[in-house]
Regions:
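Gram-negative outer-membrane beta-barrel transporters
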Residues: 473, 579-584, 599-698, 732-733, ...
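Structural signature of Gram-negative outer-membrane beta-barrels, strongest in the C-terminal barrel
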Residues: 237-243, 361, 380-392, 453-585, ...
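Acidic, small-polar-rich N-terminal luminal/periplasmic segments of exported/outer-membrane proteins
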Residues: 44-177, 563
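Conserved C-terminal beta-signal and adjacent last beta-strands/turns
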Residues: 6-9, 18, 359, 371, ...
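Acidic/polar loop-and-plug regions of large Gram-negative outer-membrane beta-barrel proteins
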Residues: 215-220, 227, 232-239, 243-311, ...
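Membrane-embedded beta-barrel scaffold of Gram-negative outer-membrane proteins
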Residues: 309-324, 328-334, 524-525, 554-637
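Outer-membrane beta-barrel translocator/receptor signature
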Residues: 142-145, 156-232, 240-244, 304, ...
């Protein structure tokens, strides 16, 4: 077996290299009528709108109408908004979209991307340029043009889906223009970041683009933890000025972090008597406390993704094939604080439990599609049709320790004392020392690769979309997708044959909407969509895994009814949207009264969204939104009426959690970001972000409090091509939590940080 020596992370050194949402508000019909004379939105007008920073249309060819006329809630975070707010990863960018929260610690992703959209876990619903991006990751933004959030059941667009929505990350590609931009930033907490984005025209219709990134920093308001990553993304395009185009690209990113789940245990752990409980909130003796170990904990990730995108425009119809090979790895060993053992309540100490994983995901995906427009009589059609195939292979091991992490004085996880006698597996809850010499008496090694678990997932799909323009006021949007989904989990057994668990399902999903246009610059729509969530949809590297208990079950089915409206106002300077929706899952996987898992549960969510984005004047831009989510676990199955891990037959009773709200779901959330550019070259910006109370568990006993966070930005144009930008995040140094784990802990947000970047364009 291979032995691993955990290294102490070195001090940071300064580095270098370079670095909306089209959602809205209720329509004001009187103002809408004033803008109606603008007429229909032709290509020239669309260019004008995008220059103003108003509507940004989705990149996916499966959207067969402009965003204004698409009967679905879609939020887009533009590259400009990402840069203004100082975002450096996907989680930073998504705070601009209300209705998205983040989960903690599940499925091999302790500190990575686990977004919840409209109350549903969407970790496995992330796409890059329309192809599913498998493998747990913390995604960077240095190679992104925009982030698209499709809300509501989306299986008609992407196949297997959790029911809340999906994310599509749009990569930067070459263009016929010579330009280079670079950004070099420093900041508090040893922050150093550099990015370069260089685009060159190489010949007739040929261009190349190179994006580079290096990032290092500590975590604001946290001891010990730090991040270190770098990335490179080259691409080349042929035929940019003709009907036949070919784009080849590669994305590489790797990180080596001292991970910080930001974990603080809840005040009501199972391991302590109720008389010593505080309440369901996390206990925080000092926000800076880091309960991990510098000489033990690590997280190392790597992503290599190669893409070939070929297309031919026949004139009115376009054939496109995009193929991708992906290889990602995520190796980590990190400290989970106390694991509900109750040591902080009982003794004022904490047990340093470890979580580890060594996972590799290899994937191939190919999508062949045809898009275009045609007319049948008086009906105008805009269509998209295609087929897809994907093959994903996940292998998963872990890291082991000698000796283990139990307290040698008690032989278990109880920690009446701390220090060397406990092998430093027990720490002082109020004053932990992350530099305890744990490695002096312990070793870490990778588990036997021959015993790695493997999950293989293959999917074959076909889809068709059509937007039918009946007349100037009425449109119909239809979409249909078929998926054949097959996944197998293989678990090796030493000295015996491996065990295998399989799930094979095919499912049909659809999207249907009717759009009424009372004016050329507005729309009112009613839509209906579905999604399917099969067992093992995460491919073995997420929070919805395959097991013998669920292998024979059908997919969970989610349906969504949505009524919404979208408007362009003030000569397309302001875009407003509003939507109300009802989402229900009628066959959720739950335990029934004989102790088995069945598709017998029900949960639903009713919600309301408002949003606005626009360039109100040449100097003033505004972006914001509000989301209301009223969730309920209608039928959460049955639970054992007696304590113990084995329940006698006939002792199951209806779940006491029936009627509770969804975990990781904020009832109210809102955000506002605005900038104003003064004639002297100075631009000032400010943002406010609100999230309501969230529960971590279905019992609604573990929770994190509501919070409001403020950010600020100032930039100054030294010359036309040189500027300085200052960002201050969490301006008031608010102590708050962003992620609530189901049982053990919650993740604290970073404290106040400030960064200053020099941005150059030439």
């Amino acid at each position: 077996m291979t032995h691993i020596t955990s290294r102490k992370h070195a001090p940071r050194v300064s580095l270098l290299a370079t670095a909306t949402l089209a959602a809205g508000f209720a329509p004001l019909v009187a103002q809408a009528a004033d803008s109606a004379d603008a007429g229909s939105r032709n290509a020239t007008e669309l260019d004008k709108v995008q220059v103003r920073g108003s509507w940004f249309n989705p990149s996916s060819p499966k959207f067969t109408a402009e965003l204004l006329d698409t009967p679905k809630s879609v939020s887009i975070v533009s590259e400009k908004l990402i840069a203004e707010t100082g975002a450096t990863n996907l989680q930073d960018a998504l705070r601009m979209v209300p209705g998205i929260t983040f989960g903690a610690g599940e499925g091999g992703n302790p500190t990575g991307d686990r977004p919840f959209i409209r109350g549903f876990d969407s970790q496995s619903n992330v796409f890059v340029d329309g192809l599913r991006d498998v493998g747990s990751q913390t995604r960077e933004i240095f190679d992104l043009e925009q982030v698209e959030v499709v809300k509501g059941p989306s299986s008609a667009y992407g196949g297997r889906d959790s029911g809340g929505g999906s994310l599509n990350l749009v990569s930067k590609t070459p263009k016929l223009k010579n330009e280079t931009s670079a950004s070099m930033g420093i900041g508090t907490d040893s922050y150093a970041r550099g990015t370069v984005d260089a685009n060159y025209v190489l010949g007739d219709g040929i261009a190349a683009r190179l994006n580079l990134m290096k990032h290092e920093s500590d975590i604001a308001g946290r001891d010990a933890a730090n991040v270190s990553r770098w990335g490179i993304a080259p691409s080349i395009a042929f035929g940019l000025n003709g009907p036949a185009q070919l784009i080849a690209s590669h994305y590489h990113m790797q990180s080596d972090d001292l991970p910080d789940a930001g974990g603080f245990p809840y005040g009501n752990p199972n391991g302590a008597p109720a008389s010593k409980w505080v309440d369901g909130r996390p206990m925080v003796p000092d926000r800076n406390n880091y309960y991990g170990l510098v000489d033990r904990d690590f997280q190392r990730t790597r992503a290599d993704i190669s893409t070939l995108d070929a297309s031919y425009d026949f004139g009115g119809h376009k054939l496109r094939n995009i193929a991708r090979l992906g290889n990602t790895s995520n190796d980590y060993l990190w400290t989970q604080p106390d694991d509900s053992q109750g040591n902080p309540n009982n003794y004022g100490t904490l047990w340093r439990r470890t979580n580890s994983r060594a996972v590799d995901v290899k994937s191939f995906a190919d999508q062949l599609g045809l898009t275009g427009a045609f007319q049948t009589g008086a009906l105008k059609h805009s269509y998209s049709a295609g087929v897809e195939y994907s093959d994903e292979k996940m292998t998963r091991g872990s890291y082991l320790m000698t000796p283990g992490t139990s307290n040698p004085l008690t032989g278990n996880s109880k920690c009446p004392t701390t220090g060397a006698a406990t092998g430093y597996n027990c720490a002082d809850f109020a004053n932990p020392n992350p530099r305890d010499p744990w490695a002096a008496t312990h070793s870490v090694y990778r588990s036997d690769k021959a015993l790695d678990v493997e999950q293989r997932t293959k999917t074959t799909s076909a889809y068709v979309f059509d937007t039918i323009e009946l007349n100037e006021q009425w449109m119909v949007n239809l979409g249909l997708r078929y998926d054949d989904f097959r996944t197998t989990l293989t678990t090796p057994v030493a000295g015996a044959a491996p065990t295998r668990v399989r799930n094979s399902n095919d499912f049909l999903n659809y999207q249907a909407g009717v759009v009424f246009k009372p004016a050329a610059n507005g729309s009112i729509y009613l839509s209906w969509g579905t999604s399917s969530t099969p067992p093992g949809m995460d491919g073995g590297d997420g929070s919805d895994g395959l097991s013998a208990a669920v292998a024979d079950l059908k997919p969970q089915d989610t349906k969504n009814l949505e009524l919404g409206t979208k408007w362009d106002l003030l000569d397309n300077r302001l875009n407003l949207t509003a939507a109300i929706f009802h989402t229900v899952m009628n066959n959720a996987r739950v335990t029934i009264d004989n102790g088995t898992s069945q598709n017998a549960g029900k949960k639903e969510i009713n919600g309301f969204e408002l949003g606005f984005t626009g360039q109100l004047t040449d100097a003033w831009s505004l972006y914001g939104g509000y989301t209301y989510l009223d969730s309920e676990l209608k039928d959460n199955g049955f639970v054992c009426a007696v304590s113990g891990r084995t329940c006698p037959s006939g002792i199951y009773v209806p779940s006491p959690n029936n009627g509770n709200v969804f975990p990781n779901t904020a009832k109210h959330s809102a955000n506002l970001w605005t900038t104003y550019r003064f004639p002297i070259g100075l631009t000032l910006g400010a943002g406010a972000f609100y999230s309501d109370k969230q529960y971590g568990d279905v019992a609604n006993t573990k929770w994190i409090a509501s919070y409001t966070r403020f950010d600020a930005m100032a930039s100054y144009a030294i010359q036309d091509n040189i500027s300085l930008q200052l960002n201050v995040q969490n301006l008031t140094d608010k102590t708050y939590f962003t992620k609530a784990y189901a049982s053990h802990y919650a993740s604290i947000a970073p404290g106040r940080s400030a960064t200053l970047a020099l941005n150059v364009k030439f």
